[in-house]
Amino acid sequence: TKTTRAFLDEVTELTGVEFDPQNPQRLLKELGAVSRFVGATLQNTSNPTRLDGGYKTNVIPGSAQGSVDVRFLPEQEEYVRAKLQELAGDRVRIETEFEDIGLEVPFSGTVVDAMVDALSAEDPDAVVLPYMLGAGTDNKSLSRLGITGYGFVPLQLPPELDFTGMFHGVDERVPVSSLEFGSRVLVRLL
């Protein structure tokens, strides 16, 4: 997407490592723990999260079911749906429990300028980059109402913290100093 390309161009500028679409890992490895997070914005993703079938260990089930968490890039919904059905085959029925949109918004305007100013006031060396979130966000619902929203989480995390590796985990956390920094930035923004 345009947002992801702008992000990667900025990372190239910061690291001196060119982005090669044929070998994205070369640049992604420069990002450390966030490489998995950013890598998910380069492609549609699917992760099987549940499998269930049968009622007893020694009985072959007549049917089974599974759940797959699918995230797609903007305007890729139909392609992904068709590809999943192709991969699953004709004997598998796919049911959608929940579907959201892929969302991309322009990284410009008074709100973005205010976020950059608030962050720069607390950390003059901060580099603000556009980013497209592949996960769920209220901004997807707000966009249906004509409201453009932005995620803004100014935490100033220590480089050694694998923050993205803790998402939705039993030990998800951030340092208190990161929250204090973020609070100061948000007060400036508001």
Annotate each language-model stretch with its function:
Residues 1-181, 187:
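Metal-dependent amide/peptide-bond hydrolase catalytic core
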